[in-house]
A protein has these predicted regions:
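Conserved Nudix-box catalytic region and its N-terminal flanking loop in Nudix hydrolases
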Residues: 93-128, 132
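N-terminal strand-loop-strand
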Residues: 70-109, 138, 142
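Residue-level signal for pocket-adjacent positions within structured domains
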Residues: 80, 104-106, 111, 168, ...
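Nudix hydrolase/Nudix homology domain
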Residues: 2-50, 54, 108, 177-214
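Acidic, metal-coordinating catalytic segment for phosphate/diphosphate chemistry
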Residues: 43-88
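A detector of low-complexity, intrinsically disordered, Ser/Thr/Gly/Pro/Ala-rich segments
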Residues: 5-9, 98, 132, 173
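General structural signal for alpha-helix termini and helix-helix connectors
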Residues: 34-38, 76, 149
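Unchanged
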Residues: 116-140, 147-204
Length: 214
């Protein structure tokens, strides 16, 4: 499950400023991490390290986190800085209802999904996250689409997310520490969607319908 949105609510008066700051911080972080990956000159490395520290301070102020904690997380991301990659599953029953999870952190409803672990494909992520969040065992049927979210839009980092049409093969539906409810929904009846999941869900419904055509 992924959720890297700001901890404080933004209003119409300041949301534009927050997005601008997040975009700037993401660019500074990327320059710093890529510089530390490739620079050999010790003076250049010192400058890039300072840039990373400044970005850490900015993220810390914005998300109310200790800058040292942010710095440690950035330092753990070795190699060339890239966008986050996620995988998610859309599982429909025979009546066209979609399996969704109610998130424990904000009470919204969304597709089982999460970040790709090292050595894992996005499709494998969709299967794993569904098992962890719902208890269901699934099989990937088709790729619905690839979605891109720029930094500052519903989260601080760039995100490339692959959403898959899947079929349930077994398992008993159950909640986890990340979810408070698991159930099938008619798309138009979902009370509150999580972030941008509604668009992906409706795209998946069209793919599901196409697969059911004789």
């Amino acid at each position: 499950m992924t959720d890297d949105a700001p901890t404080e609510q933004t209003t119409g008066d300041n949301v534009g400023d927050v997005l601008d700051v997040l975009t700037l911080l993401d660019e500074v972080r990327t320059i710093a991490q890529n510089g530390l990956q490739y620079a050999e000159n010790p003076y250049d490395r010192e400058r890039y390290d300072r840039l990373l520290a400044l970005a850490s301070d900015g993220y810390g102020d914005l998300f109310d986190l200790p800058p040292e904690t942010v710095r440690e997380r950035f330092a753990a991301e070795v190699g060339h800085a890239t966008a986050k990659v996620g995988g998610g599953a859309a599982i429909f029953d025979d009546e066209g209802r979609l399996l969704l999870v109610e998130r424990a952190d904000d009470g919204t409803w969304g597709l089982p999904s999460g970040y790709v672990d090292p050595g894992e494909s996005p499709a494998e992520t969709a299967v794993r996250e569904t098992r962890e969040e719902t208890g269901a065992e699934i099989e990937v049927v088709d790729l619905v689409d690839v979605y891109y979210r720029p930094p500052g839009q519903l989260g601080p980092h760039s995100l490339v997310s692959l959403r898959y049409l899947c079929e349930r093969r077994g398992g008993d539906l159950t909640t986890s520490h990340e979810t408070t409810a698991v159930r099938y929904w008619e798309l138009d009846d979902v009370p509150v969607w999580h972030k941008d999941h509604e668009g992906a869900a409706r795209d998946a419904y069209e793919v599901w319908r196409a697969h059911r055509q004789p």
